[in-house]
UniProtKB/Swiss-Prot annotation:
This is RNA pyrophosphohydrolase. Keywords: Hydrolase, Metal-binding. It comes from Hamiltonella defensa subsp. Acyrthosiphon pisum (strain 5AT). InterPro entries: Nudix_hydrolase (IPR020476), NUDIX_hydrolase-like_dom_sf (IPR015797), NUDIX_hydrolase_CS (IPR020084), NUDIX_hydrolase_dom (IPR000086), RppH (IPR022927). GO terms for biological process: mRNA catabolic process. Its EC number is 3.6.1.-. Accelerates the degradation of transcripts by removing pyrophosphate from the 5'-end of triphosphorylated RNA, leading to a more labile monophosphorylated state that can stimulate subsequent ribonuclease cleavage. GO terms for molecular function: metal ion binding; mRNA 5'-diphosphatase activity. A motif (Nudix box) lies at residues 38-59. Its cofactor is a divalent metal cation. Residues 6-149 form the Nudix hydrolase domain. It comes from the Bacteria.
Length: 163
């Protein structure tokens, strides 16, 4: 779904473990890494879209995670001009995202990036909390920085076993 300003409505997912590390996923057939994310369908809430994307991209179900928090506002990034598909109607110029912070409550072995016929990712690993901000593609960097700043206090509490 694309809004009136040309932004595709989307959810982003940060998954953390008990050590405060976050799941970092490798895009299929590329050497490009990112957090799981995906579009919101017309009839879905952001939370419903998040659970659908969680299953489609990582093979995880609602019982495998716990929602710790989400952003209370939409974050946007613009696509570089060479990535915009100008011949589509409506034209999508970027993403408008709600982000969720999840705690993985199941074993790592439940993560399956090849659970669909057209996987988004072909690998994943745990990385330190701030690592993605430095490593994500440049046009997403500001959004990642904002998300991680907002989620930092929750991950700190997990590391201290307070939540």
């Amino acid at each position: 779904m694309i809004d009136n300003d040309g932004y595709r409505l989307n959810v982003g997912i940060v998954i953390c473990n008990k050590k405060g590390q976050v799941l970092w996923a490798k895009r299929y057939g590329q050497y490009s890494w990112q957090f799981p994310q995906g579009g919101i369908h017309l009839t879905e809430s952001p939370e419903e879209a998040m659970y659908r994307e969680l299953f489609e991209e990582l093979g995880l179900n609602k019982k495998d995670v716990r929602i710790l928090t989400s952003t209370h506002y939409w974050l946007r990034y613009k696509l570089p001009k060479h990535l915009v598909r100008w011949n589509t109607d409506p034209v999508c110029i970027g993403q408008k995202q709600r982000w969720f912070l999840l705690e993985l409550t199941c074993d790592d072995s439940n993560i399956n990036v090849e659970c669909t016929k057209a996987p988004e990712f072909d690998g994943w690993c745990w990385v330190s909390f701030w690592y993605p901000v430095r490593q994500v593609v440049s046009f997403k960097r500001d959004v990642y920085r904002q998300v991680m700043k907002e989620f930092f206090s929750f991950v700190s509490l997990i590391q201290k076993h307070l939540i």
